[in-house]
């Protein structure tokens, strides 16, 4: 409930789409939130019938992950502090994960993989076993280096407007049914 309260309060402070998306992804990755290592957001472009990479939050490699998480721990940063770091995120043109995600365009077609399927079906997918991973291989997942992950549609008035993908690529912490249900 505290997570919901903090995110709701943060969302009430802005009308800027980029900042709203940042708040959502920060809640997905924060140790006080859902605690995933990375979160990526793809928005639906109805005109071109595509998903377009919009934002990526999280480290690009294990060294960066260690550095970031150590800084969060040393500075005792809470979810609110991480949300308030939006201006730093906005000014960092060197975020490799963010730039990688922004370079991705996925046709809204079943053959394009699980990210496209999430948007088309309007339901979450969990790739948390080896069997599921082998059946969901696609070039976009390979680009991001992700093996086990969850996806969830982002909806507005029952219409899918985007897809969030989250993984634990660095900690290799198993993604459980409880994580997916949060």
Briefly describe each language-model feature range.
Residues 61-136:
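Regulatory sensory and allosteric helical modules in signal-transduction proteins
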Residues 133, 155-160, 169:
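Flexible loop/coil segments at beta-strand boundaries within sensory signal-transduction domains
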Residues 140, 162-163:
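Short glycine-/small-residue motifs
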Residues 135-139, 143, 147, 168-182:
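Regulatory loop-to-helix N-cap segments in sensory/regulatory domains
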């Amino acid at each position: 409930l505290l997570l919901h309260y903090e995110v709701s309060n943060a969302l009430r402070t802005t009308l800027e789409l980029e900042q709203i998306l940042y708040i959502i992804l920060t809640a997905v990755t924060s140790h006080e939130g859902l605690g995933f290592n990375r979160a990526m957001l793809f928005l639906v472009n109805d005109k071109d019938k595509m998903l377009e990479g919009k934002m990526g939050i999280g480290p690009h490699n294990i060294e960066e992950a260690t550095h970031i998480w150590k800084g969060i721990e040393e500075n005792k940063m809470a979810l609110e502090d991480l949300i308030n770091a939006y201006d730093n995120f906005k000014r960092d043109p060197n975020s490799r994960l963010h730039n990688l995600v922004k370079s991705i365009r996925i046709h809204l077609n079943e053959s394009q993989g699980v990210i496209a399927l999430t948007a088309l079906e309007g339901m979450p997918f969990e790739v948390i076993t080896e069997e599921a991973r082998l059946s969901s291989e696609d070039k976009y997942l390979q680009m991001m280096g992700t093996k086990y992950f969850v996806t969830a549609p982002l909806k507005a008035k029952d219409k899918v407007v985007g897809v969030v993908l989250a993984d634990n690529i660095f900690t290799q912490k198993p993604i459980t049914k409880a994580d997916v249900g949060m």
